[in-house]
Amino acid sequence: MGSPKALLEFRGETFLDRLTRVFSQFCSPIVVVVGAQADDIRSGVKRPERAIFAENANYQLGQLSSMQCGLRTMPEKIEGVLFTLVDHPNVQASTIAALLEQPRPLLAIPRYQGRRGHPIYFGAGLIGEFLSIPPDSQAKAVIARHLDETRWVDVDDPGILDDVDDAAAYRRLIETA
């Protein structure tokens, strides 16, 4: 695609600027984990004050290692975590609001037309579990252990499914904007 996903443009903003703007309406701090091309991403963000950047030196181990890096950067006393991937830039603010409705469950996962997506919410009680599994494994292992404690949040937001993994997916995203 020619540049880091975080710096791809969507509706006049980079993916990362859009996500930090939307998420900052609901939570603080916003922790952004960078790995490959970290300097390019930091310098390409238009509103860096909205985020705390954490650099994952082990990003090549996969997404869980980046999640763990971000969790280690969080303040000690938090209620929970909203977690998303930078290649899901089209999530609506209303979806985040729905995930954060009280009382908050251990896990909240959005669904659109029966398909689950991002972001997810998890309570602080799960942070230790995510940190305890090998960084080259998958977060799904922790989520699977707690499906009976999960609130499934049905939303009218196809953006939770938008996963921009290649140039074709990016074109589809831009065409729907």
Predicted regions and their residues:
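Nucleotide and nucleotide-moiety/phosphate-recognizing core
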Residues: 1-116, 124, 129, 146-155
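A conserved catalytic-core signature of glycosyltransferases
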Residues: 116-117, 138
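Conserved alpha/beta core of the MobA/IspD/sugar-nucleotide pyrophosphorylase nucleotidyltransferase superfamily
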Residues: 134-177
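Short glycine- and hydrophobic/aromatic-rich loop-to-beta-strand nucleating segment
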Residues: 118-122, 162-164
